[in-house]
């Protein structure tokens, strides 16, 4: 399998990832090594795109899909769609949420140990995510006009208004203490 096809770019290929000893890429699956940690970044930046992937979680797992992100400061200079065990969190931190900014409209995750599908489409200010075919987030990032504040008035951790963050950046797959697996990560530029 080549890393680029007419369908897009296969992100889980050594030439497309900044691989390190904290992650294992084997037989098309990516998972944390015995000494796991941190976020694994794409080599390239992406602006407008559609990414699709499959993931599965272990018990009480917390992970995330970072996008349009600066790897040097991912929390403040980028975006994350939350990946987590179903029912583990509440509010704007549940599975499928735009982390700390927009609560997922539906919690669509399968039980730990089962493969889930996720898609994320970004075009200009529009961000749409699905989990297992159900739309979790569909927002216009230009609505986030103040630092540390969501459009609904709730507080977030982002010092910069989300509308002012770059519209291009790296993808990151997060390890946050519990096993998580990824496969079939395909990106198409729009």
Regions of interest found by a model, annotated:
Residues 1-190:
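Carbohydrate-interacting regions of secretory-pathway proteins
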């Amino acid at each position: 399998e080549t890393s680029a096809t007419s369908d897009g770019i296969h992100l889980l290929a050594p030439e497309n990832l900044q691989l390190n000893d904290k992650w294992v890429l084997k037989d098309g699956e990516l998972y944390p090594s015995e000494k796991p940690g941190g976020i694994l970044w794409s080599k390239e930046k992406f602006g407008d795109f559609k990414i699709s992937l499959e993931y599965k979680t272990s018990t009480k797992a917390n992970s995330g899909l970072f996008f349009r992100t600066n790897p040097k400061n991912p929390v403040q200079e980028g975006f994350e769609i939350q990946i987590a065990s179903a029912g583990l969190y509440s509010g704007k931190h549940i599975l499928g949420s735009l982390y700390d900014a927009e609560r997922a409209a539906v919690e669509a995750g399968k039980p730990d140990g089962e493969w889930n599908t996720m898609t994320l489409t970004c075009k200009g200010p529009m961000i749409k995510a699905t989990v297992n075919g159900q739309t979790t987030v569909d927002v216009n990032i230009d609505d986030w006009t103040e630092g540390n504040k969501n459009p609904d008035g709730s507080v977030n951790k982002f010092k910069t208004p989300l509308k002012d963050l770059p519209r291009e950046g790296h993808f990151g797959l997060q390890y946050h203490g519990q096993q998580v697996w990824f496969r079939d990560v395909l990106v198409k530029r729009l």
